[in-house]
Design a protein with these regions (language model features):
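Catalytic histidine neighborhood in serine/cysteine hydrolases
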Residues: 207-219
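N-terminal cap/lid segment of alpha/beta-hydrolase-fold proteins
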Residues: 1-18
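Hydrolase active-site cap/lid region
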Residues: 113-160
Length: 219
């Protein structure tokens, strides 16, 4: 395993292969990691087409430093920006899965000149309030008292702190327009029971650019 060491001396695990540009960076989803099938298939595509490729684990995920509940959207945004700044050269295509789609948009806002294009795979943004609203009244009281709760969703469970919800709202993408003229593709499954089918349209409506495609899959 290869690691990038950040300014706090924390390890960010990543995999990389060399190739021509524009490079590809894959960003995983919430409570996921770079070991998923999407990352593997995209890596295979990059190798076949001689494109540089990087996938990584955000802090608190996979092989990277720390526990999941100790980090926020701002931390993970910092991770992808570190990957772009320290491990890549030239234009990059960001591919974000689920929450990774939110992070790719935040990274594009922070480093617009480094982005060649964006591809969202069931990309979802601004979900802090939705997560909070799904918490039971009992657990909201526990969260208020202790600052942390065990969150269960679609067969998975993980811990979330009060700071996660507050920070997520500070990073909401849909609050203002984003001037982005590079190609963007948003791919969404019509039977997705996690990401709302209208999410790609909501994202598209906040982009000041015409080079946007929304692709719906029947699955």
């Amino acid at each position: 395993m290869t690691y990038l060491i950040n300014k706090k001396n924390q390890k960010i695990a990543y995999k990389a292969s060399k190739g021509k540009g524009p490079g590809i960076i894959f960003i995983h989803g919430l409570n996921s990691d770079m070991q998923g099938l999407k990352a593997k298939y995209i890596h295979q595509y990059a190798k076949k087409n001689n494109l540089s490729f990087i996938c990584f684990d955000c802090r608190g995920h996979g092989k990277s430093f720390g526990n999941f509940e100790d980090f926020t959207m701002s931390d993970w945004k910092e991770d992808i920006i570190n990957i772009i700044d320290k491990l890549t050269k030239g234009p990059q295509i960001l591919i974000g899965s689920s929450m990774g789609g939110w992070l790719m948009l935040l990274a594009a806002q922070a480093r617009p000149r480094r982005i060649a294009g964006l591809i969202g795979l069931a990309a979802v943004t601004d979900f802090g309030n939705n997560l909070y609203n799904n918490i039971s009244v009992k657990n909201k009281k526990i969260l208020k008292k202790t600052g942390i709760i065990k969150y269960k969703s679609f067969g998975f469970s993980y811990y979330l702190r009060t700071k996660f919800f507050k920070d997520a709202n500070k990073n909401n993408f849909l609050v203002k327009k984003f001037n982005f003229k590079k190609p963007m593709i948003l791919i969404q499954g019509m039977k997705d029971d996690v990401v709302d089918i209208d999410t790609p349209k909501k994202i598209s409506n906040k982009i000041n650019g015409k080079n946007i495609q929304i692709i719906y899959l029947k699955s």
